[in-house]
Amino acid sequence: MQAYFDQLDRVRYEGSKSSNPLAFRHYNPDELVLGKRMEEHLRFAACYWHTFCWNGADMFGVGAFNRPWQQPGEALALAKRKADVAFEFFHKLHVPFYCFHDVDVSPEGASLKEYINNFAQMVDVLAAKQEESGVKLLWGTANCFTNPRYGAGAATNPDPEVFSWAATQVVTAMEATHKLGGENYVLWGGREGYETLLNTDLRQEREQLGRFMQMVVEHKHKIGFQGTLLIEPKPQEPTKHQYDYDAATVYGFLKQFGLEKEIKLNIEANHATLAGHSFHHEIATAIALGLFGSVDANRGDAQLGWDTDQFPNSVEENALVMYEILKAGGFTTGGLNFDAKVRRQSTDKYDLFYGHIGAMDTMALALKIAARMIEDGELDKRIAQRYSGWNSELGQQILKGQMSLADLAKYAQEHNLSPVHQSGRQEQLENLVNHYLFDK
């Protein structure tokens, strides 16, 4: 079959002096960073949905892209053509992983039977493509939010029959992910929330969602899936308020239903923006709570209140994110999935490469800067100094539960405590970070 991207062989690393827009300037897969290949640190993935399913439509205009697999025709044949182009893209971009929703790769059909049969055929196609290309599946998931049946949610729907349909999709998508060797399975509650409390029973919906997640965990163990289950937090859109608002909210939910040891988090940069947090904050929070799993690498627009899903281009922002990830030991089953799309006006097919190349270079440079921060150790040293009092006898007795509130009050009076505030030196630390960012 003729190549779709016929003007490009493969994207290659050419170094920072290159002016070739279809070459990497910073991402060198084989470069060693802290003793590990860059490719192994970053674990890049391209997503199926924004890259090959979006047709350029928005709320104010119809599809703007001319994609051959989005033209009228037999649904399965078009899905197979889309898979051909997708794996050509993955290969030429040098990404080791990809991600999908069930209906990204397979026609939904008019019934559950058609859905299952179509998906089974496409899983065989994807398995062959993976074998041929060496590209692996980072994670799969089920789209339980686009079809009108999910207007009031999937797991939180007032109709148990909709709940059951969603369960069928998750079973099918998880088993497909397992068969394809996927390293994670993602759960994003696209419409698990509410528009108005006037028709919503919050307790009922929370119980439904909790039971659904428990069943997902049960099924994972039943089929022997060894990958990681991930929830992707998002505060709103498409609903007014979603139950998986941010990392801290999801932690509370998981604790309530006894799932905190079973499910981790897939953190998206743009969702952090919508929640009023920095990307850095959400990553650090997930790590602090022991829930860090994977990342959807993109960016939002602080001046817009919706998910713009742009490609990451801020080395400054992502250097601190990669610093947190490296400090925590790096990715295990997770990676950096580009949940990002070209702009509606970017209608040239090679714009897909420009977006991903820039994003991969951004994250590669961020990784190298983060590694310098780790090797230097100055930030860690400053934080250790700031909290050093907690290593004292008093600090340890407090943390180990050896002193009560009354004991502390007595101690403070007996020792005539008069603590003096110590500077946080924020400005100095910001200058230090800029040194890593901008000084060679």
Swiss-Prot record:
Cellular compartments annotated:
Cytoplasm
* GO molecular function terms attached to this record: magnesium ion binding; xylose isomerase activity
Family that this chain belongs to: Belongs to the xylose isomerase family.
Q: Name one GO biological process term.
A: D-xylose metabolic process
Q: Does the keyword RNA-binding apply?
A: no
* InterPro entries in the record: Xyl_isomerase-like_sf, Xylose_isom_bac, Xylose_isomerase
Q: Which gene encodes it?
A: xylA
The name on file for this protein is Xylose isomerase
What are the UniProt keywords, alphabetically? Carbohydrate metabolism, Cytoplasm, Isomerase, Magnesium, Metal-binding, Xylose metabolism
Name the lineage: Bacteria, Pseudomonadati, Pseudomonadota, Gammaproteobacteria, Enterobacterales
| EC number(s) per entry | 5.3.1.5
- Positions binding Mg(2+) 2 in this chain are E268, H271, D307, D309
Q: Which NCBIfam families match?
A: PRK05474.1, xylose_isom_A
Write down the chemical reaction(s) this protein catalyses.
Answer: alpha-D-xylose = alpha-D-xylulofuranose
User: Broadest EC class?
Assistant: isomerase
Assembly and binders:
Homotetramer.
Q: Which cofactor does it need?
A: Mg(2+)
Q: Which GO terms describe its cellular component?
A: cytoplasm
Q: What is its main location?
A: cytoplasm
